[in-house]
């Protein structure tokens, strides 16, 4: 086939411009990305060769070779991995097939350090070569194809690329970077080695360079016809913990998670017994951009006896821990394991249970840290992943108690929206006569904090948790108690503060009897709007509030379901009135404006809890009429 000249996809042109003009100060990343791609190519070959050993073509020793040519001003990265066919070269090097292209550009922050890390995360690392090169030549042949089906791909990064069919005996890919002016400092064995050791020391494949020795006569380093391995070349998780430095763990995390930031914590151990496996797990310091996407694929990298099997093996972790990154290397699973087999395997179930326990232990260690740095780390974790962790209350019955101890909430104990109160902290501060853990749900912290339902709790100095995450109502349908103390909504049912409100209860019964004519007339006036009307002692400043019956859906949950486009039963609340409030005291069952006052008290209560009025115009008209009558 003759040479073809083709145009880059529009997004690639934009990306090339970014690489060349915006990321220059962090140019070392080009080598990290190209070595990482070479490592992936070797993993893919190993995986495909499980079913077709002939793909090794009598060259089973996988490696990456790095070289440079001072005279030609080139750097070459060569691998004997899976290689590419002509169609694959065009698809992989000329277009970005991922749906995340737009997200990639929207995430660019202008911070070169952060933006550089996004490159690997979005699978566009190859183009980082243009940071230092004004021309890139790729020669490749896919394993299993004849030598006559080699491919040469070349581009100057200016919108077009050329593809040609060539004769290539060797399997794999050779990338040659033709350096830009001013990049000659990279043409040094020492410089290239230092970049590899900084970013790619953990790569399980040997990275080879020609050995150099000092030549006394020439007064310079001279290349020898002998290879040396310039990285550790062993899978980091297979080493003893004592042999791995914190810096190496951090670099490995950045490689495996495609993340530029350090992890908050990690755990590394080998499990022996019924199932034998090694796990190296990390807690990231921030959430990925697509964590809440429906098609987000979390999970760990799965290896079997050090052979890479798959990315995103979500069967190894429950959904609520999908943010955990890392590697599991099993000694028991078959090498031809598929995602379908993973779902049915007993060994996988045992691994999943073990990984879950280990991940929770890691989070418990973070949560229970007593030093300021440790506490700050858990705050960072909670801010990024707290809402995801709450899913575990409903998903993981076996570990529900452990997950509950990790939860954090805002509360009336502090005057900020910081979610830093553990359920154990709340229980430790409970009043001697208090038997329940009280909470209120709302759309915002401000709405929760100012909820009229909290008035009696403030009066009595009883702490209330302020729950404002969308997942909270769902979570509470599974979290019924903690440490033997039931959780109770301050906006549901007939409020019972136990011994804390004996006097008020007695007074409420007496007042309720005295106000029965007014209450009955209000119920008749409001009709289907309310399930009931009753006198309450839970209010001290507000004239009225709405509460849900014990077995009914709350107004907050109903609004949330509607916002999500789901059907929800109509909300028929109980209207509670404060008999000590002047507006309620002024109510007269036989008054001409009694109906207007009833509707006003209902509408005010609905607004106070974050609800929406069905007929705002009537509310305004009614309010104006009552104001005018008072003014007169």
Swiss-Prot record:
InterPro entries given in the database record: HATPase_C_sf (IPR036890), Heat_shock_protein_90_CS (IPR019805), HSP90_C (IPR037196), Hsp90_fam (IPR001404), Hsp90_N (IPR020575), Ribosomal_Su5_D2-typ_SF (IPR020568)
Q: Which GO terms describe its cellular component?
A: cytoplasm
Q: Where is this region: A?
A: 1-339
Cross-referenced Pfam families, in alphabetical order? HATPase_c_3, HSP90
Query: CDD domains given for it?
Result: HATPase_Hsp90-like
In terms of PROSITE patterns, this protein maps to: HSP90 (PS00298)
- Disulfide bridge positions per record: none
Where does the signal peptide begin and end?
none
- The superkingdom listed in its UniProt entry is Bacteria
| Renumbered residue ranges of the record's region B | 340-559
Region (C) location: 560-632
State the compartments where it is located: Cytoplasm
What role does it play? Molecular chaperone. Has ATPase activity.
Give the family from UniProt.
Answer: Belongs to the heat shock protein 90 family.
Subunit (UniProt)? Homodimer.
Q: What's the protein name?
A: Chaperone protein HtpG
